[in-house]
C-alpha cells in the first residue's frame, strides 16, 4: 500500500518525533544495505548524507575516513546526531538543512538518501528534491537511494519503482533499481496493523537505486 501525503511533513512533525522518543527509523546502527554499499566500493567522497537522522551513516563513513556532511531538516535530529557522534568518539559534521535547498559546496561525489525520498507525496515535491540534489552534486556523482517499497505491508510511506524513475528522468541516469530491505523498529503507529509487538525489529521491502547525475 502506498501512503500518499498531501504535502511534505513539517519540520515540527519531525522535530516532535525526535523529542518524544525513538522514531521507527532510528535503529541504533547504520542500515545494513548502506554498510554493504561501502564495503563493495559504492562510496567516494565528498559525501552528503541527506535526512541523516541520528547520524549513523555519517558517523560510520567519517570513521572510515570519508569526508562526510550529514544534514537533517529537524534541529533536534542534528542535536542528537552530534551527541551520538561524541558518544562514539567520532568527529562527524552535521548541519540543519532543507532537502529542497541543499548545500552546493564542495560538490558532492556521493549522496546517501536512506528513507527520505519516500516521504515526498507529490510529483512537484519529488521534482524539487531531485533538482536540489542535482545542484548539490558534481557531474557524474552518484545518488544511493533507499526507499520503502510499495510491495511492503504499510510500515511507512512507500513508493513504486515507476515513481523513482519518473522523479529522476531528467538530468540523471537510473543505473540500477534493485529490491532490498529497510530495517526499522515497530512503534505504536504500526504495531496493531502489523500484528507485532512494539520494539520488534523488522526488515521491510525496499528499493535500492543507484542514480548517476549527468
PLM segments and residue spans:
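A short SAM/SAH-binding and catalytic strip from SAM-dependent methyltransferases
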Residues: 109-124
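Conserved SAM/SAH-binding beta-strand->alpha-helix loop
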Residues: 74-76
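Conserved class I S-adenosyl-L-methionine
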Residues: 1-42
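A short glycine-rich, Lys/Arg-flanked "PGG" loop and its adjoining helix->strand segment in the class I
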Residues: 127-139
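A short acidic, Gly/Pro-enriched loop at the edge of an enzyme's catalytic core
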Residues: 100-111
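Conserved SAM-binding loop
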Residues: 81-82
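Conserved SAM-binding strand-loop segment of SAM-dependent methyltransferases
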Residues: 88-99
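Conserved beta-strand signature within the Rossmann-like core of class I S-adenosyl-L-methionine
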Residues: 140-147
Amino acid at each position: 500500500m502506498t501512503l500518499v501525503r498531501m504535502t511534505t511533513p513539517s519540520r515540527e512533525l519531525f522535530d516532535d518525533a525526535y523529542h518524544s522518543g525513538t522514531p521507527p527509523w532510528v535503529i541504533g546502527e547504520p542500515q545494513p544495505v548502506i554498510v554493504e554499499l561501502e564495503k563493495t566500493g559504492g562510496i567516494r567522497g565528498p559525501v552528503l548524507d541527506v535526512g541523516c537522522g541520528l547520524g549513523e551513516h555519517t558517523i560510520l563513513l567519517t570513521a572510515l575516513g570519508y569526508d562526510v556532511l550529514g544534514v537533517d531538516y529537524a534541529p533536534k535530529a542534528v542535536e542528537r546526531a552530534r551527541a551520538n557522534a561524541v558518544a562514539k568518539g567520532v568527529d562527524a559534521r552535521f548541519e540543519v538543512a532543507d532537502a529542497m535547498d541543499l548545500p552546493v559546496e564542495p560538490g558532492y561525489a556521493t549522496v546517501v538518501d536512506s528513507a527520505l525520498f519516500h516521504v515526498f507525496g507529490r510529483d512537484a515535491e519529488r521534482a524539487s528534491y531531485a533538482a536540489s540534489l542535482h545542484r548539490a552534486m558534481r557531474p557524474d556523482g552518484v545518488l544511493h537511494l533507499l526507499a520503502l517499497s510499495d510491495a511492503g505491508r504499510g510500515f511507512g510511506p512507500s513508493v513504486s519503482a515507476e515513481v523513482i524513475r519518473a522523479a529522476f528522468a531528467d538530468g540523471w541516469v537510473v543505473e540500477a533499481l534493485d529490491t532490498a530491505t529497510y530495517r526499522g523498529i515497530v512503534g505504536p503507529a504500526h504495531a496493531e496493523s502489523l500484528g507485532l509487538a512494539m520494539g520488534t525489529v523488522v526488515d521491510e521491502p525496499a528499493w535500492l537505486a543507484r542514480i548517476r547525475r549527468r
